């Protein structure tokens, strides 16, 4: 908790800095990376280093007492090692307190480095004669861990390492130059030391650089994965909001599952639907009440409105009705022009459903009355309510709209049509459910509606309880109404309705709520949506950027909070704690097969270490033919391996590469992309370097070995200090320690293969350690013992070559093992993050596609783009005026007779299944390229409404040639023909004889989106009304059009037959035409289309 509090405090400071702009954001990201680096690398590595150093101190003490050395002769050693152990243990305790570690990071690094350097000088100065090779391995260890394990940055690590190596070189050079004795090899030894230190610096810097690059990549992948999760959560939230804004929850999730299955395709693994029918998302509900309401006088008012005023008025009115519906536990079903209908008792049955609908109707009448009183506009509300059973759900494949069907729904519609403006007209069934809650009076609906008379429906008017109290608005008309009498009625309406403040359609797409929800989860409503052409955009405001940064910081803090020094040793859901293998075998196989383009650089670094070993041995070893031949053969082998690895790049750079050398290009590609060639080359490369580190040790001349006193010689002979001959011979074998240093460099060469299998490197180093210890402690032990005993009277542990070599190799082996494991763990972690990121991106794409399908299922694509791409400041309602749109109504009148409710057809469900098939087949036509310009608007019962000409930019309509300007009208006629063909095919399979009746008209329309809850795209205007009348007054199996439309069709090559003058409700007498179904057209249209 302390660490989390600390991280959160830092996050708040970073967020405050982020508010300052781009520089602040960069500081915030830098701080997050530093925290991530600190907890994932610096903290665990410094802990491991302290453990290694403390373990080494304990091992030295154990070896000291195991060898039975005299305490009096090694007082300095016994003081130095326990003191260092105590200091390192104290630092270890403090480092384990993470808050202290974070604050004193640099101090701990400096103290550890100083302690190690001090230990090296103490070992050098106390314990016997100082030699040119003294403590080179220990100082090499310091140099290497300064880069790889101490939490220094690269600059500080270079400075500390240079100080370490140069101080050792300078001290030894000055001290030995002033000491009497043989100095003929001093220069070469010091130069060899310098080469060893340079190699240690290069290997350490290389290791640090690659590890930092790998960690930066892991950090980026972590951030990307977290961002993708944020985005995925957002997409899921977004699609749920979209889906629930279109459909009720009880049916939305079922449809969502099918869409996802369809988007994912066969790979998702679900069984394909073997049913010949489309899925039907319709359910039966009993005991519900249906309300139909129509705004009387709105058609006349709308004729004087501008597009913006019309859409604004409808949105405000229906937004108010939605609010009233919510208050009265009603669900709005659909908006049909200026008609509004809803149901109470869905999806959960409600005992007060009739009371809810009646109260809803009274509230609607009251709302309209307030509008009429406030504006003086003559509009009113006619409401009809009936109670019964319904089938509710969604039919078709596109432009889903939740709807209800049943005889009771039809009756409710006629209750509205047979009602009176300003009154709520109810049936006797609804009256029974009211249980006396309202006073009623005779409705006499059968007088005004023949359907009610035919079905002997007894109707009533509900008496409004508020009717006896006249509102103040009725008594005193507002001043602005009287003053504004000269204003157009639409202007007065618009100004008044603005005070209602109805929510805008799809406002939730850009809803700016808090980043954290009540359950503690982080909200993601401000993350940009998607990667599609209309979704690929940046965060739009500074506040959004700030919130997104805060959320990302919070998630990163959670990730960092879960990282500690012991995490990789504890149980993980993905990675085994000992072997570091993935539990998932497929992921393990995929990780092993990962391409490794950097492998050639690993080989290059290993070859540079080999070069350093060669230079060191050339400087100090006797120049023999075996030395030359052995290193020459090794050089040729490594150069060949290096050439094969770089062959691809070399041949790509060369313009005149021979085709015979293409196998080299393929070979380098195989090495980079396949694991087994890499493993083979790793084994060969490291085997050559490790072997050459000690190879020439087996070819020491006999004279160099026999002139030395052996272990069998009496102690008296070997311990005489004035044995000048023995000392002279011993000094001639000054190169022996450099074999040990070469072995250490050989082990380091194994560690440079960072991304190669950890277990392979461990096995190679283990084999090398066993082999080296066998040489040092067995095969060549007598040479090393004799050398040490001749050079030193009572050699200490760090002066005795055999002990020093074995301990040094073991310490380096453990250090490299820890580094290798750490590297492997984070490489695997990085791969895991990438793998999760990839999967989450695929899931995000599915969610984005789902959102797109959902939104384009209710809106045309260009309208969906408007809502997704708009700026937050653009809160205007969407509306668009078009001069030439072709509108079609295609109905199946016979379906009303076909629809029956009985036990045989599951109370009408099977009838709706057939209607679903018909509408779905009609919708299938929309996916054909030639009908891409056809926009389905809605279905009304068994009537299919569509339009063309809505996709064109209105400003471009007049710029087109007349023929092209009206081509979409021809497309609509073609679509009507296709509908007839589809219906004929269904008739053959279902043994029915349904006929299509089509009405088409063209002209100006207003398009817009209204309704915050269940937003709906619709078109309005006289063109739409006339098209509807062309259908309702039409003839089965005929396409009826107006005279103006017939003239356009004839110019496009269609033939039309005059029907004559017919009376159209609300329009008077109109001359109409039938489009000939023989489709006798000239070739002119096909030429235009081409």
UniProtKB/Swiss-Prot annotation:
Phosphorylated by RAF1. Activated by forskolin. Is not activated by calmodulin. Inhibited by calcium ions, already at micromolar concentration. Activated by the G protein alpha subunit GNAS. Activated by the G protein beta and gamma subunit complex. Phosphorylation by RAF1 results in its activation. Phosphorylation by PKC activates the enzyme. The keyword Repeat applies. Gene3D superfamilies: Nucleotide cyclase (3.30.70.1230). The chain crosses the membrane at residues 45-65, 75-95, 107-127, 132-152, 157-177, 186-206, 601-621, 626-646, 679-699, 734-754, 763-783, 800-820. It catalyses: ATP = 3',5'-cyclic AMP + diphosphate. It comes from the Eukaryota. Mg(2+) 2 binds at residues 294-295, 338. The protein contains two modules with six transmembrane helices each; both are required for catalytic activity. Isolated N-terminal or C-terminal guanylate cyclase domains have no catalytic activity, but when they are brought together, enzyme activity is restored. The active site is at the interface of the two domains. Both contribute substrate-binding residues, but the catalytic metal ions are bound exclusively via the N-terminal guanylate cyclase domain. Catalyzes the formation of the signaling molecule cAMP in response to G-protein signaling. Down-stream signaling cascades mediate changes in gene expression patterns and lead to increased IL6 production. Functions in signaling cascades downstream of the muscarinic acetylcholine receptors. This is Adenylate cyclase type 2. It comes from Rattus norvegicus. The gene is Adcy2.
């Amino acid at each position: 908790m302390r660490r989390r509090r600390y991280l959160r405090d830092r996050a708040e400071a970073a967020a405050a800095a982020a508010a300052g702009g781009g520089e602040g954001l960069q500081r915030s990201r830098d701080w997050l990376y530093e925290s991530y680096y600190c907890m994932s690398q610096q903290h665990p590595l410094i802990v491991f280093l302290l453990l290694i150093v403390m373990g080494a101190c304990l091992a030295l003490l154990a070896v000291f007492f195991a060898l039975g050395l005299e305490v009096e002769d090694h007082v300095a050693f016994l003081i130095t090692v326990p003191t260092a152990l105590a200091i390192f243990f104290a630092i270890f305790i403090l480092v384990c307190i993470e808050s202290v570690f974070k604050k004193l990071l640099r101090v701990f690094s400096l103290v550890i480095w100083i302690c190690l350097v001090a230990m090296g000088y103490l070992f050098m100065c106390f314990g016997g004669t100082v030699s040119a090779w003294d403590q080179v391995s220990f100082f090499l260890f310091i140099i290497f861990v300064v880069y790889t394990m101490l939490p220094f940055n690269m600059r500080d690590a270079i400075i500390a390492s240079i100080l370490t190596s140069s101080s050792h070189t300078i001290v030894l050079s000055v001290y030995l130059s002033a000491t009497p004795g043989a100095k003929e090899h001093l220069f070469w030894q010091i130069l060899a030391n310098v080469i060893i230190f340079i190699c240690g610096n290069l290997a350490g810097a290389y290791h640090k650089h690659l590890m930092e690059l790998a960690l930066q990549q892991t950090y980026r992948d972590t951030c990307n994965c977290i961002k993708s999760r944020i985005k995925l959560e957002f997409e899921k939230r977004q699609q749920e909001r979209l889906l629930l804004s279109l459909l009720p929850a009880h049916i939305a999730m079922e449809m969502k599952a099918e869409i996802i299955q369809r988007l994912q395709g066969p790979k998702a693994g679900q069984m394909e639907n073997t049913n010949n029918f489309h899925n039907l998302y319709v359910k039966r509900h009993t005991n519900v009440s249906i309300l139909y309401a129509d705004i009387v006088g709105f058609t006349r008012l709308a004729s004087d409105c501008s597009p913006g005023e019309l859409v604004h008025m409808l949105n405000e009115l229906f937004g108010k009705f939605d609010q009233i519906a919510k208050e009265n536990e009603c669900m709005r079903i659909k908006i049909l022009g200026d008609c509004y209908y809803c149901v109470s008792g869905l999806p959960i049955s409600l005992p007060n459903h009739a009371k809810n609908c009646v109260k809803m109707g009274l509230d609607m009448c009251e709302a309209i009355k307030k509008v009429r009183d406030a504006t003086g506009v003559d509009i009113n509300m006619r409401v009809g309510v009936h109670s019964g059973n319904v089938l509710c759900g969604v039919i078709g494949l596109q432009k889903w709209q939740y709807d209800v069907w049943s005889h009771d729904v039809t009756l409710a519609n006629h209750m509205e049509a047979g009602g009176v403006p300003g009154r709520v007209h109810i049936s006797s069934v609804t009256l029974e459910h009211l249980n006396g809650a309202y006073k009623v009076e005779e409705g006499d609906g059968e007088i005004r509606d023949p359907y009610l008379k035919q079905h002997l429906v007894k109707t009533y008017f509900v008496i409004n309880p508020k009717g006896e109290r006249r509102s103040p608005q009725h008594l005193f008309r507002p001043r602005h109404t009287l003053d504004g009498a000269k204003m157009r009625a639409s202007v007065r309406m618009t100004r008044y309705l603005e005070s209602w403040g109805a929510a805008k359609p799809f406002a939730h797409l850009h809803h700016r709520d808090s980043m954290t929800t009540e359950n503690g989860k982080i909200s993601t409503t401000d993350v940009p949506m998607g990667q599609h052409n209309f979704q690929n955009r940046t965060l739009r405001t500074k506040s959004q950027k700030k919130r997104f940064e805060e959320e990302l910081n919070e998630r990163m803090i959670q990730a960092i909070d879960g990282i500690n020094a012991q995490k990789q040793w504890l149980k993980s859901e993905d990675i085994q704690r000992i072997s570091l293998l993935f539990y998932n075998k497929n992921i393990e196989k995929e990780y092993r097969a990962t391409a490794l383009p950097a492998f050639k650089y690993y080989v290059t670094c290993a070859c540079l270490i080999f070069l350093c070993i060669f230079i060191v041995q050339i400087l100090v070893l006797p120049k023999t033919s075996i030395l030359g031949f052995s290193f020459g053969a090794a050089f040729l082998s490594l150069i060949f391996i290096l050439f094969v690895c770089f062959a691809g790049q070399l041949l790509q750079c060369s313009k005149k590469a021979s085709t015979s050398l293409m196998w080299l290009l393929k070979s380098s590609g195989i090495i980079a992309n396949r694991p087994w060639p890499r493993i083979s080359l790793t084994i060969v490369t490291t085997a050559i370097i490790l072997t050459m580190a000690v190879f020439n040790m087996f070819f020491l001349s006999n004279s160099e070995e026999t002139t030395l006193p052996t272990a069998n010689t009496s102690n008296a002979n070997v311990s005489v200090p004035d044995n000048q001959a023995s000392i002279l011979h011993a000094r001639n074998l000054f190169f022996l320690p450099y074999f040990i240093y070469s072995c250490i460099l050989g082990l380091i060469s194994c560690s440079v293969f960072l991304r190669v299998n950890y277990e392979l490197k461990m096995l190679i180093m283990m084999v090398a350690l066993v082999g080296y210890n066998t040489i040092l402690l067995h095969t060549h032990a007598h040479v090393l013992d004799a050398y040490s005993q001749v050079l030193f009277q009572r050699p200490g542990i760090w002066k005795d070559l055999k002990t020093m070599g074995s301990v040094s190799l073991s310490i380096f082996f453990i250090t490299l093992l820890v580094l290798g494991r750490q590297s492997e763990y984070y490489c695997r972690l990085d791969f895991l993050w990438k793998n999760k990121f990839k999967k989450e991106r695929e899931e995000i794409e599915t969610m984005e596609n789902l959102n797109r399908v959902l939104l384009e299922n209710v809106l045309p694509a260009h309208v969906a783009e408007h809502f997704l791409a708009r700026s937050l400041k653009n809160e205007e309602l969407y509306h668009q005026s078009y001069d030439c749109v072709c509108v079609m109504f295609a109905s199946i009148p016979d379906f009303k007779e076909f629809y029956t409710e009985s036990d045989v057809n599951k109370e009408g469900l099977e009838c709706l299944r057939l209607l679903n098939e018909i509408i779905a087949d009609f919708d299938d036509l929309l996916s054909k390229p030639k009908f891409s310009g056809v926009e389905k608007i809605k279905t009304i019962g068994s009537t299919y409404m569509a339009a063309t000409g809505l996709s064109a930019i209105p400003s471009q309509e007049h710029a087109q040639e007349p023929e092209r300007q009206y081509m979409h009208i021809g497309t609509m006629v073609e679509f009507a023909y296709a509908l007839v063909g589809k219906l004929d095919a269904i008739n053959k399979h279902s043994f029915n004889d349904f006929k299509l009746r089509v009405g088409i008209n063209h002209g100006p329309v207003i398009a817009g989106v209204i309704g915050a809850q269940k937003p709906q795209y619709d078109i309005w205007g006289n063109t739409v009304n006339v098209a509807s009348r062309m259908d309702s007054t039409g003839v089965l199996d005929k396409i009826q059009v107006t005279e103006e439309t017939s003239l356009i069709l004839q110019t496009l090559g269609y033939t039309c037959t005059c029907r004559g003058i017919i009376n159209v409700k609300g329009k008077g007498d109109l001359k109409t035409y039938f489009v000939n179904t023989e489709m006798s057209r000239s070739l002119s249209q096909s030429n235009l289309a081409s």
